[in-house]
Amino acid sequence: MEIPKTGVETLYPEFVVEVGRVTFGEENRKKMTNSCLKRTENLNIIKATCALLNSGGGVIKAEIHDKNYNYQCHGLGHDLETSFQKLLPFGSQKYLDYMQQGHELLIFVKSWNPDVSSLLPLRICSLRSNLYQRDVTSAINLSASSALELLREKQHAAQRGRRRLHPPRASNSNLQEEEDMKMLASEVFKKDRLMYKEKLNFTESTHVEFKRFTTKKVVPRIKEMLPHYVSAFANTQGGYLIIGVDDKSKEVFGCKKEKVNPDLLKKEIENCIEKLPTFHFCHEKPKINFITKILNVYQKDVLYGYVCVVQVEPFCCAVFAEAPDSWVMRDNAATRLTAEDWVLMMLDIPSAPCNLVTDSNAHLKSPASSAFRSPVCPTKVLEFKGALQRHLFPVTQKTIQFKPESFCKKLFSDHKGLEDLMKTQTYPYSQGIVVFSRSWAGDVGLRKEDRVLCDALLIALHSPLVLYTVLIDPSWAGGREYAWNVALHLKRKLQSVGGYPGKVGIIPRLIQLAGTWCGPGDGSVHYPQSYQLATEDDMEDLLQALVVVSLCSRSLLSDQLGCEFFNLLIAEQCEVLSQSLQETRELFIHCFPGTRKTALAIKTLEKIRDLFRCRPKEILYVCESDFLRDFVIHQTACLAVTRKTFMQGEFPKIKHIVMDETENFCSKYGDWYSKARSITHPRVRGAGNEDLHHGILWIFLDPFQVRHSDVNGLPPPPAQFPRKTITNGIHCAQEIAKVMKGAMKRITENPPSNMSPHTLALFREAACGEALGAHALPGVCETKADLTVEQIANYVAERCHGLFQCGYLPKDVAILCRREEDRARYKLALLRAMELTETHSATEVVFSQAAGVQGEHIILDSVHQFSGLHRNIVFGLSPEQRLSEEFHQLCFASKAIKHLYLLYERGQVSENYYK
């Protein structure tokens, strides 16, 4: 097979395998006199198909031999169709499309898509497994599904550490079993000589195989068939291969002594067996256990020849006759998998090699083996992808929508004419979505290019995907290569990470603001009609795959989806929590930092209202902060007050109370807990002390951020009962969650004197690790220490400038100071720095305090005033960094969703501090 071209020499952003000149058409292929050439053409095409199926799909390009060939009239050829049917028994049309372009036939190959509903989904496609088993008297080359089943059995047996043994059977002359043939064969094996035409008293079975060769080339024939039978016996229950016995008459003939050198034959057999590929699940990794014995065959006391007996013991793991006939794209060529690679991919074992697909462009990372590996993303992302798609990318509108809106607004404002140009480019499509990004290259893990203004992905009805790359410098020679690679990698991501099951191709197009500019041959990129999004359901499936891809990357779109994803998780968690409302009227809810307890508390108010059908003014929310109270008032119709107001007022109509951020409470104005309980659980004198009613009193607190442990008014931890602890819903980026986990770990290792033993017992590193993995999304966390105030301000200004250029808004950002008195000092430095960097058009830079959290401006306030509130991007500013500052790290980190920047004026943080 010719080495395929997969670089930018090809028009399609795909792996393009060139198989040379091929004869197509049923009649033409029937007339071929060179049967060897016919088989070679067939084999080259089928190998290329297998390799592309296993490597994310692509295109096979064949030069048509007959100049009068017409695909519509002549078809492919029966032998080619049969080969495709064997490779894809459930329908080749699901994976293959054909298109004639002049004197070339293109075969479009979709990425292999395992049937996830199957108990044993096949992760890759194979021509033959070359893993054999005995089936009575036959050696069967197992189908891929049967091979997978065998591998699973071997894997489980190795994990159990027990080998299946067959107990000895009591002798009974009236019973005959297959095991008897094995015993009789073992008796033959013990002999030293046999007689010519002696008839053996047993036949072939699961454990016995007879072979007789009349050809002159005995040794080559033995070496040809030996791997099949050794693999079959080793993978079943062991057995005997007896060479020199007729399988029909069971007579001993042997191999004539003139044709065989017994010592050489024995050596050849041993060498052949020792070279067989094996795969081990066990730690011992033994070799194939076999014994070769040569028996003399005599004819009237004269040496006639030899019988060769190969005894094969059952193998602990898997023995292959040869490497599986399965192919992938590696180093720009269709390459056969080794047995080890094949097993790892079949079983989807994470340690599988990741370099099976390489790209000729060193600076552009290749799709690698992820094209045929299972998607690696949080399970909940897959569960919520439909809801997220409908929230951000609804397909019901009969227009072309530009998303994300904030980025598009910024982009079109800065670059006049771009919006009209994109509308022209997307004409005549009337229904679809164009997803803009500052760099789709960066979003899929490639290097960003400064000469690219933006990328835009068109997902439209009745169209394949189109990736528009808007160039700043149209003379840049690398533009076409850039667009080609981004399209290829984005397609791979949609399949491997997003799990898109349909046929997908992305057409790259280069444009500039002055008008359309297409690279050479750009207009020649055509995909079959089946690659178009035919229905709204197809669009939704593709957009849901894009949602998953985006959530697993770092971008504005990822952050917008991530915030909504965390909101869905919180709503789900509240559904579970609210199931306790009916039977648990009083409850202490201990929440880890990052679990968004205020959001849980707000949703609990709604659940109380719906469950008990009460008026909003009968439900009271109590918190410590005025700013948090104002925020909650905008979120719910229920009454919301601070603890101070609660202690000073009377609330005769209140039936249910939810108390939030009680870790900040103190008993300065009285016993708030007793007052709350007297409202929700009042007693009537003279009525036998019976409860008038049992209202809800739910108390939310973060036990790691208790400020006044001695005077906070809470019952002592042992008396906080009934109690629920929420540790498995850390709703922020993985990098931020790790900071919180590290801080909590250090707190428990060196606890302050006012921390209760109960709080220490709450933190279990294993449980926290599970919480991180369950909902982990990528984010950003950076730490800088030993900075001046000016350096801190410059860092914040530069970061904000970069973020705003990518479409983030001032309302996404909170700059939090450790102390309230630091706000004024930082504000002046920040304003100067932002004027220098022209952040958000410097004249518009406005800082708001926590009270303006629902406004459009950057928040600049103390972390304490921001209690209970969150923003996507948080800068934590502190005058110093001490190793005892875990409390403030938790405060900063628990306010951030996707971006956290910790900046310290003094004190160098050790390298391992945040690990």
Swiss-Prot record:
Signal peptide: none
Chain residue ranges for the region called Disordered: 157-176
Extent of Basic residues compositional bias: 157-167
UniProt-listed InterPro entries: Poxin-SLFN/SLFN_N, Schlafen, Schlafen_AlbA_2_dom, Schlafen_AlbA_2_dom_sf, SLFN_GTPase-like
Enzyme class (EC, first level): hydrolase
Superkingdom of origin: Eukaryota
GO BP: any one term: rRNA catabolic process
Cellular component GO terms held in the UniProt record: cytoplasm; nucleus
Region (Required for ribosome binding): 390-569
Cofactors that this protein relies on: Mg(2+); Mn(2+)
Region (Required for endoribonuclease activity): 204-389
Any one Pfam family match given in the protein's UniProt record, by short name: SLFN_GTPase-like
Keywords: Endonuclease, Hydrolase, Nuclease, Nucleus
EC number: 3.1.-.-
Cofactor note: C-terminally truncated SLFN14 endoribonuclease: Requires manganese and magnesium for its endoribonuclease activity.
GO molecular function, one term: RNA endonuclease activity
Protein name per its UniProtKB record: Protein SLFN14
Source organism of the structure: Oryctolagus cuniculus
Gene that this sequence comes from: SLFN14
